Amino acid sequence: MPAMYLGCTFVLMEAFDPAGLIDVMIANDVTHAVLVPSQIIQLLADPAFDEAHIPSLEMVLTVGAPLHLEHKEELVRRMPKRFYELYGLTEGLCTVLDRDAPHSKLGSVGVPPPLYELRIVDDDGNDVPVCEVGEIVGRGPVLMPGYYKRPDLTAEAIRDGWLHSGDLGRLDEDGYLYLVDRKKDMIISGGVNVYPRDIEELVVAHPSVRDVAVFGAPHPQWGEHPVAAVVLDEEVDLEEVRLWVNERVEARYQKVGVVYVVDAFPVNVAGKTLRRVLRDDYLEG
């Protein structure tokens, strides 16, 4: 909306096409692009997506879902001083990682903008120590008054004036927010909490893997174990990928039991990967 008020030109495509989008950016001297992670990953597969080919581009903003660190680093390498990441909920909570943030903070999703507040709390609503994992809660000037005709959902989401996100994260000593996972996506293996995102960051570092989604599946001994659905850049022995990942995880309960290939991930309208759909399809198949 601010861009529209300033009279900016909007360039729209009928459907997303990586090569076509690059051509459109070049032909129209596009300065700002707002993309979801799955689109950025596809663009990074094209060597023409860099500052030399698209010199007009001043900002690449990723929204809708977390972008893996591996892809952030590649994007920053190709498009220096152009990367921004927005994390937030429509209900009224957000953080921004801007292009001037230190490289050491690239794994984060930034800090709250002015007038916004953020806390990390335990299940009882108490603040947790710096760098410890808890639920992300926040408030700010655009906090919603509630869900339409759903006082039950409103009471669950807003407690004591703070919006509970349902996301797990941690704040570092400088106030930068690091996303861990959705509470509902957490895997419990052998009684231990396992966060899919931690494993995904390892899997996507494999040279043959373009993208990954990890979810929990039933296991007769541990209750659940991690399963990795991958989109590949090239053919590879999946057992080799599984062993490669399991040599690098920090703990036994993070070891991946199964790796399998999909052409693409199911996503919602915001571009977020639907792990629950993947899990259901996997269990049915």
PLM-predicted stretches and their roles:
Residues 121-122, 165, 171, 267:
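Hydrophobic alpha-helical segments, especially N-terminal targeting/anchoring helices
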Residues 48, 56, 81, 115, ...:
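Glycine-centered tight turns that cap/initiate beta-strands
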Residues 8-28, 37-39, 194-199:
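ATP-dependent adenylate-forming carboxylate-activation enzymes
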Residues 1, 5-8, 27-35, 44-105, ...:
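Gly/Ser/Thr-rich phosphate-binding loop
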Residues 25, 33-36, 88, 140, ...:
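AMP-binding/adenylate-forming catalytic core of the ANL superfamily
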Residues 66, 104-149, 157:
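Adenylate-forming AMP-binding core of the ANL superfamily, especially NRPS adenylation
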